[in-house]
Amino acid sequence: MDAATPGNGGIISDVVFVIEGTANLGPYFESLRKHYLLPAIEYFNGGPPAETDFGGDYGGTQYSLVVFNTVDCAPESYVQCHAPTSSAYEFVQWLDSIRFMGGGGESCSLIAEGLSTALQLFDDFKKMREQIGQTHKVCILICNSPPYLLPAVESTTYSGYTTENLVQKIGERGIHFSVISPRKLPALRTLFEKAMPVGLIEPQPKDYSQDPRHMILVRGMVLPVGGATSVPGVIPPKQPISQPPLPVVPPQIANAPSHQLPPVQPPYMQVPQQNTLTTAHAAAQSAVEAAKNQKNNLPNRFPLPNLNQMPPTSAVGTPFNQPPPPAMPQNTSVPKMVTSTASLMTPASQPSLVTTVTTGPGPAPVQLQQQGAQQQPVPPSMPITGAAGGVQAPQPSQPQIGTAQLPCTQTPVNGNKLLAWSGVLEWQEKPRSVSVDNNAKLTRSLPCQVYVNPGENLKTDQWPQKLIMQLIPQQLLTTLGPLFRNSRMVQFHFTNKDLESLKGLYRIMGSGFQAGCVHFPHTTPCEVRVLMLLYSSKKKIFMGLIPNDQSGFVNGIRQVITNHKQVQMQKIDQQRNMGAGQAVGTGNVPANTQAFLQKQPGALPVAQAVPQQMQGQQVAPGMPSISQVTMMDEQQRTQNLLHIRVQQPQQAASQAPPQATQTTVQAPGQPQNPQPGAMLRPQNPGANPQLRNLLLSQQPPQTSVPQTQQPLHHMQQAAQGMLPHQAMGQQMQHQAPGQQQLQLPGQTLMHQAPAQQWGNQMQQRAPIPGTLMMSAGPRGPVPQQGLQQVQAQSVMEDDILMDLI
């Protein structure tokens, strides 16, 4: 195993998975994926794959997938290749999309075709990484059959090479070759041995197989040691697990060999990343022995691991979040390892603020000295609270967050990183106090440093001393993902001079925001105009992405945020309109109408049509709801109502003479048979001025309606879905109280006396032939001035857009 190639120890990796895509591997692939492939991806990714983790195409780990088949796949190509990606989440989706087909009649597979394509990918990686330099190259072969004794034919560069020639070529180029197979095939072991890098003396390989039938030959990465009972997919070994002085070692500790321990540091100091594997192996042995001692001793006895086998531990504590305090041995300077499958598998979606409990060879902090007198046992499953801080913490699925531990330390900057800039980062957040105004903003700032990889040319001499950051909501990250491509990646590190601001930064970046837009003012003569600060909840680091295409990125993020604001404003307008509609419906409907609605929830009167639609009831089956009726400007609506009230006596006088032969007027006490499909109406429609307003707007053209009702035509336009034509069987001619209704040839009119009871209206009336006429008026879209004005005033400029513009 190459000790100089830890997963996230600052070395950028190029990883190619070469997988047999035949039915011979299909039944075993899920087990291999679960036990080996996902842990390997987490090893290179620095944590479980997350959809919001983005890395630059030229600055992070690159993954590529090659799927090869057998000779019976003709006329299809022997190999399918996926272009490189820097997203581990996307790569896992590629793995899940493989269709294992064919190969049932073949005893071999076209491994030579797959390896030749993989070598071509590494050639492409070399061109892509010219600015970065040397990278850590890994090729992983996953198959269940030996290779054909045939040379590669589909590759242009490596055509004619046999499988053995290709693996030798892989070793000569310094590519670490690994083999994962569900069976122990001698031919595959021979390929692994021939692919040994030139001049490298390998130690005895470890047994990483989780099943005795599997053959796992690994080079250039670290997997969980074989025989573990833990569920795969735990935190990869490159993330150091902090060691609190807990007396409890759960039985599931056997999975701990997959975790490294960082070297010792004084309390509350930065923790450098572990670059050797011997420490992890020693920690694994001590953890297993501690688990055995836990089973052999009494429940109230707390065994200590052998100090000769225990590696030095860091001052970073494991996060805890619930009482009671742990029982502490008096020798608090002796650390103990506590890991469990449950805690390791806890999702990392919680805020990254942790209460720290530190131990080490040096003097113990005050918190531990205060707890030293307590010797009571604590069950293994019980969460524990640190003595100081009082800050709630997530489960230990976020082990590497030194900075957030009361935040006094932070995830370290790798030793091979170079300091590029040092200054202050400033941002605004909403105060946590409930009594503070919602529009109030709290300005915070923190000293920070920007680190780059060796060899990267980042001109920061013209950068301002203070950088202003605007927070980006978490829901926009997936939309902004494509904009993060083709970017240079830097690492931000914050000092702990202002603990309150550091807490606030981790709180907001770990809960509702996971990104910030750092804008460089135009007054500074630097080439960078915008920088995206991302927080990786898995890696517990702040990454800065500097887009190579600055103008394109600015335009893209401006468009994304503008669209997001428009969607938010539309939701706010809809909620406001629904609230206004409910207020109108409950405040202006007569009491007798409301009482009827309570008794007859299935029947909907005309007078209730507009407000009740806002409450989810429909006028008739299939009719769409209309929120436009309630979206008029309040002042314009009041003026229209007053205007119509003045004109009503004139309407009554003008409509009295044309009463003729077919007028159907009903006395107060007489029953009336309503037409099938006709809408019900309240006893006194005139008691509601807004509904009377709507009814008057529906007068047929033959009744001389004054032209002063024209301002309400746009209201009628919006209500067309509520007042359908004859095709829907709805006949709704309405008249104001006190007016005789006129039935002209080809029309059906109804009139109801104010004193008539609702029960009589439920009877049926014979249908009257004729056509239904609607009031004349403009049918095109009529602008709603009041609504447009409200929308124009309600769209506010976002802080990020202001800075970007």
Swiss-Prot record:
Domain of life: Eukaryota
Protein name per Swiss-Prot or TrEMBL: Mediator of RNA polymerase II transcription subunit 25
Ranges of compositional bias, category Low complexity: 647-678
Subunit annotation: Component of the Mediator complex.
Entry function: Component of the Mediator complex, a coactivator involved in the regulated transcription of nearly all RNA polymerase II-dependent genes. Mediator functions as a bridge to convey information from gene-specific regulatory proteins to the basal RNA polymerase II transcription machinery. Mediator is recruited to promoters by direct interactions with regulatory proteins and serves as a scaffold for the assembly of a functional preinitiation complex with RNA polymerase II and the general transcription factors.
Keywords recorded for this protein, A-Z: Activator, Nucleus, Transcription, Transcription regulation
Pfam families, per the entry: Med25, Med25_SD1, Med25_VWA
Locus of motif LXXLL motif: 691-695
Localization annotation: Nucleus
PANTHER family in alphabetical order: MEDIATOR OF RNA POLYMERASE II TRANSCRIPTION SUBUNIT 25 (PTHR12433:SF11)
Species in which this protein is naturally found: Xenopus tropicalis (Western clawed frog)
GO CC annotations on file: nucleus
